[in-house]
């Protein structure tokens, strides 16, 4: 028998976060989950859309991270919106606490994945974009797409 792959298996991605925030830095954190949450997460039944992280009492907690109840779970199923604890080193938590206290900075989850069988969260320190920033991003993306299209047409001829 061959070995099981020990790579990274992405489960949930918060694509909206990259549109609504300027990402300053990323870091990886472990997740503290109960059994039915892990099973439901492996099936991809989670939502990061409104999730955010806060530093409280020297620990980092993720709020509004929805993991659907496990279909085959019984009365011991989990609460879908239960705050989840993140596992980080003390110095990282202290640094994030200092960053979180700065005006305009927030901690948002970007994606959830399994790495060597353990649930991990890609956490970002971010600043919210203004409406005109979003419009600039859309305009630059459209300009890039038009340029690529014209280059492709020129190469065909």
UniProtKB/Swiss-Prot annotation:
GO MF term set: RNA binding
Localisation: Cytoplasm
Presence of keyword Cell membrane: no
Keywords: Cytoplasm, RNA-binding
Organism of derivation: Syntrophomonas wolfei subsp. wolfei (strain DSM 2245B / Goettingen)
Disulfide pattern: none
GO biological process, one term: trans-translation
Protein name: SsrA-binding protein
InterPro entries linked: SmpB, SsrA-bd_prot, SsrA-bd_prot_CS
